[in-house]
């Protein structure tokens, strides 16, 4: 998911996405441990999506403090 797409979402939607990404990362790590993971690059992608989502949430938090 691109950062621009994340900026278009509401704060509640972002928080839900963050939970979904973390859940997916948990499942991917479990698959990796049991050697059932077909695409290990997906772990990296999900981690980056988590970081992007947290960044957008933090930016909104800082904007709210300024206002």
Swiss-Prot record:
GO biological process: translation
SUPFAM superfamilies found in the cross-reference section: Ribosomal protein L29 (L29p)
Gene Ontology molecular function terms on file: structural constituent of ribosome
Signal sequence range: none
InterPro entries: Ribosomal_protein_uL29, Ribosomal_uL29, Ribosomal_uL29_sf
Coiled coil: none
Keywords in alphabetical order: Ribonucleoprotein, Ribosomal protein
CC annotations in GO: cytosolic large ribosomal subunit
Similarity comment text for this entry: Belongs to the universal ribosomal protein uL29 family.
Protein name (Swiss-Prot/TrEMBL): Large ribosomal subunit protein uL29
Lineage: Bacteria, Bacillati, Bacillota, Clostridia, Eubacteriales
UniProt gene name: rpmC
